């Protein structure tokens, strides 16, 4: 690739993107929003396991969210590219606030005294299902807005800080979720979640309007909807990066079983659950901040493969551990390696995607990557029921290593990729 091309005109200032006021507003709003959602997901996993005492029930939480998220992802990308993105994002945050408010109502003593545990659990699944539809719009909208807040030479730096903000929020949300469940209970934790979502809404209102960009010619709706998918399949580096991450997360979804490990194997309680749930993200944020100041200069493709392989090994170690400190350390290192994967994949997507297709390509990315988290949660729950909790997590780690080997052989363009 030509060293003078726009892709390679990358700033060496680690704080370049942070100096842009609108980018700071986007990061602050996204931080608050993601922190609230991670608190809610931590709470829901613990709450459902407390109601059912069944690992498979945790898996069904993921399935409840992923079915609508995948089903609507392509159409959501089409709508995002045709819409004013700031308004669309604010609507998504509003609907998430409504979902959290409904969960808050379900947690009250009135509902607990008038409905069975099964009915409450089904109600939780229904709310998560609806939030999956909203998620198919909000996640890609954030990604599409990102590129319009910074100049192109700042994209790698902005992507790194964006992932750092996301991971910091995830760490804080997971840890605070466990801490608040233990100290103030489920209902008051949900009040906190609702408050954070309201704050995120008002912060994101400070963004400038983001109108749709001109599209290349008139297209039928279905043709436009599938254009992002066709673009990803034509762009080999992007397809390989998405596929590698998707299958690694799908089979390496050990975090889905953290409630079981915390409660039944490690005897760590809600507080330990919160820290174990946050361990992967703590590791990831450390490496992402490190990469912001010391970015990878070459061989990013090979480093991506090594990182995902190391992630699989850490998952196996976590599965076999019966000591809290070792379990936390295994997840922490897994998070560091996952952080490398996140930065490389995110940068590849931002650099390879045309501006007028960012919504659709981001939606395809959400189908590949984000939805694999919930599918991995379901796979982990199903495997735990069939094989037992520990063997199922070992199996997931081994499958991650197999995926790395297959992708290494089948995707030489990603293996050789540099930016």
Residue ranges, per PLM feature:
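Flexible cytoplasmic inter-helical loops of multi-pass small-molecule transporters
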Residues: 2-11, 205-230, 419
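Helix-loop boundary and gating motifs at the non-cytosolic
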Residues: 8-68, 230-280
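C-terminal transmembrane bundle of multi-pass solute transporters/carriers
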Residues: 61, 71-75, 82, 86-88, ...
């Amino acid at each position: 690739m030509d060293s003078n091309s726009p892709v390679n005109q990358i700033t060496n200032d680690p704080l370049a993107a942070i100096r842009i006021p609108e980018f700071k507003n986007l990061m602050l709003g996204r931080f608050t929003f993601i922190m609230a959602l991670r608190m809610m997901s931590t709470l829901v996993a613990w709450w459902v396991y407390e109601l059912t005492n069944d690992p498979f029930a945790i898996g069904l939480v993921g399935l409840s969210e992923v079915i609508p998220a995948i089903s609507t992802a392509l159409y959501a990308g089409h709508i995002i590219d045709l819409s004013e993105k700031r308004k669309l994002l604010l609507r998504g945050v509003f609907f998430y606030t409504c979902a959290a408010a409904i969960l808050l109502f379900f947690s009250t003593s009135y509902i607990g005294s008038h409905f069975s545990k099964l009915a409450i659990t089904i109600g939780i699944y229904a709310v998560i299902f609806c939030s999956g539809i909203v998620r198919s719009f909000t996640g890609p909208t954030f990604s599409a807005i990102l590129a319009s807040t910074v100049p192109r030479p700042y994209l790698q730096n902005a992507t790194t800080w964006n992932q750092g903000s996301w991971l910091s929020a995830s760490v804080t949300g997971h840890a605070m979720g466990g801490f608040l469940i233990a100290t103030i209970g489920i209902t008051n934790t949900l009040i906190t979640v609702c408050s954070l979502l309201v704050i995120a809404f008002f912060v994101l209102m400070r963004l400038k309007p983001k109108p749709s960009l001109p599209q290349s010619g008139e297209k039928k709706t279905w043709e436009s909807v599938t254009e992002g998918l066709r673009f990803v399949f034509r762009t080999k580096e992007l397809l390989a990066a998405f596929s590698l991450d998707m299958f690694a997360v799908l089979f390496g979804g050990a975090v889905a079983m953290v409630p079981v490990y915390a409660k039944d194997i490690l005897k760590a309680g809600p507080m330990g659950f919160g820290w174990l749930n946050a361990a992967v993200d703590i590791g990831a944020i450390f490496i992402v901040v490190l990469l912001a100041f010391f970015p990878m200069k070459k061989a990013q493709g090979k480093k991506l493969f090594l990182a995902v392989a190391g992630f699989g090994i850490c998952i196996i170690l976590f599965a076999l551990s019966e000591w809290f400190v070792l379990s936390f350390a295994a997840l922490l290192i897994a998070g560091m390696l996952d952080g490398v994967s996140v930065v490389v994949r995110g940068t590849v997507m931002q650099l390879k995607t045309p501006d007028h297709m960012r919504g659709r390509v981001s939606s395809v990315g959400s189908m590949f990557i984000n939805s694999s988290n919930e599918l991995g949660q379901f796979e982990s729950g199903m495997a735990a029921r069939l094989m037992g909790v520990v063997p199922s997590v070992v199996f997931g780690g081994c499958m991650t290593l197999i995926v790395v080997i297959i992708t290494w052989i089948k995707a030489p363009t990603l293996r050789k990729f540099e930016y």
